[in-house]
């Protein structure tokens, strides 16, 4: 197995274990956990930028009002996504948290078609229809409207759509997003 495959495997293992971690923190206020996640993500991302010597792009981004607004919007959307996900898992609604990530691609497709005027082929439409039927079947089995799953899935789809307007590398982008919501997190912690 090559290095890239091992990295992908490692990511999926960590991603799969993440709900267990959040569930272990169920006794802690979810908003506090979210605030800590933002703070530590920001610190870690800043460290990565400094190590990779990419830190000099931050002042240029901070001077650009349009970019600041875009990063703030992305930061707020990822904060909603992270926060609702943490809350969903902490309250034992694991199935709903999982369902969100089945809904997300469908939301992304709708956004792509409506906002970016992307077109799907007939085969792609069949795939979307099958995915939609599968998600709706899961929703019916769930027994109620999985509103937290909708919030998680939709917030991540909107986040992805906004990210199309960001030209920076991924580590710069997530750093700026967490930096933009850092005052909210610090305000909550203090």
Segments from the language model and where they lie:
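Glycine-/small-residue-enriched transmembrane alpha-helix faces in small-molecule transporters
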Residues: 1-32, 136-165
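Residue-level recognition of pore/gate-forming positions within transmembrane alpha-helices
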Residues: 38-42, 102-106, 128-131, 178-182
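Membrane-interface interhelical linkers
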Residues: 1-10, 43-71, 122, 174, ...
